[in-house]
Regions:
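Conserved ABC transporter NBD signature motif
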Residues: 53-64
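Helix-to-loop junction immediately C-terminal to a conserved catalytic motif
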Residues: 48
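Conserved structural motif at the start of ABC-family nucleotide-binding domains
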Residues: 2, 16-19
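Catalytic Walker B motif of ABC-type/P-loop ATPase nucleotide-binding domains
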Residues: 156-160
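Conserved ABC ATPase signature
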Residues: 131-135, 139
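A short, proline-enriched helix->beta-strand linker immediately N-terminal to the Walker B motif
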Residues: 150-154
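Hydrophobic anchor residue at the start of the ABC signature
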Residues: 145
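The feature captures the beta-strand-to-loop junction immediately N-terminal to the Walker
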Residues: 33-35
Length: 162
């Protein structure tokens, strides 16, 4: 379970989320709705550990503030609404960034097969070798979604998904 207790997020002097209390149960799908500028994206970024906050965020009994950020993020698949990627990469390379060994930049055959399979399941397998910048905005979002799925997250947080 992911729980937010008395969560407040500020951007400068502006409070974008104020005293949020909510529990997200495992196995359920939740949608956060509201007008533009009401703190939905800020809440997701805060859960992912990108924004400072007041209050408490816990997942399976672990508190964000007391957990190494890299360990906190492992079970979370977060897709921001404005993903930026290296323009020189193909769609498949972008997907692989989700699990590539950052020290060696090597990819196993098994991982390559898994990435290609996810892309095919999402209906974008035919785009694997196209440059990411030559894809439509919607196709790029699907590539980013494939990248998130390749990480096999326990929690999916999608900000403005297609």
């Amino acid at each position: 379970m992911l729980e937010l207790k008395n969560l407040t997020v500020k951007r400068g002097d502006l409070t974008v989320a104020d005293h949020i209390n909510v529990r997200f149960e495992e196995g359920k799908v939740y949608t956060v709705l509201g007008p533009n500028g009401t703190g939905k994206s800020s809440m997701l970024k805060t859960i992912f550990g990108e924004l400072p906050h007041e209050g408490m965020i816990t997942y399976q009994g672990k508190q964000l503030e007391r957990t190494k950020l890299a360990d906190w993020r492992k079970p979370i698949g977060y897709m921001p609404q404005d993903s930026r990627v290296d323009a020189s990469l193909t769609a498949l390379e972008v997907v692989l960034l989700g699990r590539m060994d950052s020290l060696t930049m090597r990819v196993s055959d098994e991982l390559l097969t898994e990435a290609a399979s996810i892309m095919t399941q999402l209906g974008i397998g035919h785009l694997a070798h196209r440059d990411i910048l030559n894809l439509s905005g919607g196709q790029r979002q699907m590539v980013m979604f494939a990248q998130v799925l390749l990480r096999e997250p326990q929690i999916l947080m999608l900000d403005e998904p297609v």
